[in-house]
């Protein structure tokens, strides 16, 4: 648990600092997640760890820090299935949205994380389109073109539904399971 929590906090720090600013709303989103999934003690520990990560990031420079991020992603990917990695990335997307907008540097950081976690880059576009309710967005959620056949639509739906099914991430805590349920519902609506 501790190594996962540390790796998770390293990734969260990467997203929070990606735009060059530490926003209160992003930190509060992280704290709420820690509180719900790990308890109040983890919030205090998380704040201390994040502060140390920010300090280390300043001292070591971008290239060295990105190597730590890569290593953390590889460690997480080695111990989690793809559905769990998707939910982790989904939470980091929520952190990036917490201040009301996603900076281009945050988007690049999220793309890096998706790649380093072994996820297809299209999953990010799908995550950003889940909350939209038009036909074009529905195709983007499913990762297919508007010219797709019915069979292609059905296959894409089955793939997404399987990846985001709440039962696949139940071991990661209630908050993650609820987020997966929300995504699963949005996929059904698409």
Locations of regions flagged by a protein language model:
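Small-residue-enriched hydrophobic alpha-helices in membranes
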Residues: 1-17, 21-190
């Amino acid at each position: 648990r501790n190594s996962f929590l540390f790796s998770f906090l390293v990734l969260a720090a990467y997203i929070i600092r990606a735009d060059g600013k530490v926003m209160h709303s992003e930190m509060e989103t992280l704290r709420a997640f820690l509180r719900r999934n790990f308890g109040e003690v983890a919030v205090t520990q998380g704040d201390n760890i994040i502060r140390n990560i920010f300090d280390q990031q300043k001292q070591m420079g971008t290239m060295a820090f990105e190597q730590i991020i890569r290593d953390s992603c590889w460690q997480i990917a080695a111990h989690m299935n793809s559905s769990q990695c998707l939910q982790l990335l989904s939470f980091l997307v929520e952190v990036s949205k917490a201040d009301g907008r996603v900076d281009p540097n945050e988007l690049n950081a999220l793309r890096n994380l998706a790649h380093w976690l072994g996820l297809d880059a299209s999953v990010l576009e799908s995550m950003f389109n889940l909350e939209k309710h038009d036909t074009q967005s529905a195709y983007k959620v499913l990762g297919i073109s508007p010219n797709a056949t019915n069979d292609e639509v059905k296959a894409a739906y089955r793939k997404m539904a399987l990846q985001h099914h709440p039962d696949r991430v139940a071991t990661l805590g209630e908050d993650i399971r609820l987020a997966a349920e929300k995504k699963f519902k949005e996929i059904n609506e698409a």
